[in-house]
Amino acid sequence: MQDKFRGQYRIPSARAQWWDYGWNGAYFITGCTKNKKHYFGSISNGEMRLSRTGVVADILWREIPHHARHISLGAFQLMPNHFHGILILHAPDGGDGDYSASDLPTAETGHALSLQPGKKRFRNQGKNTVSSIIGGYKAAVKKHANRLGFEFDWQTRFHDHIIRNRQAFDTISQYVLYNVQNWEKDCFYTPGDKSGFPFHT
């Protein structure tokens, strides 16, 4: 891709104080594992190979619309030690940014896995905000991975970027789609073991 996102695809870590994260719009989210450990799997021959913990994280991301109202999912990709995903909020009474969230396409990438819809796997979301949704997702992944006996923990914070227009949406979506192929150039890159398997289950 020709257009870079913020120069080196770096994402600000602090919430924007001037923005209500319950407003309608699209949000680019990045969450990292604790100490950048390869909990989610490994990349081999340009493909992401999910660990069992990665399968849990993949399934639960796709469950988000069952637990948070008026949410659609854009591009999503698990990497060995982090994930990238786009959340689209489109509540009928929500405020809008510079464009209408209903105009944006939705897309699912990566591993198409699913659970029985409607099962309550997340904590009560409370307000339909980015922080509550991602907080619920991260808590659910940790809870279910640990319950299954898999070592796992998150870095405390997550990174977000408010997507303000369609061009930015398309640029970021392409970055997510090609993230696996560009793994060794990624700012979160750390090497795996020589076998190509992840360090953790």
Regions found by a protein language model. Give the residues of each.
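Short catalytic/metal-binding and nucleic-acid-binding patches
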Residues: 1-201
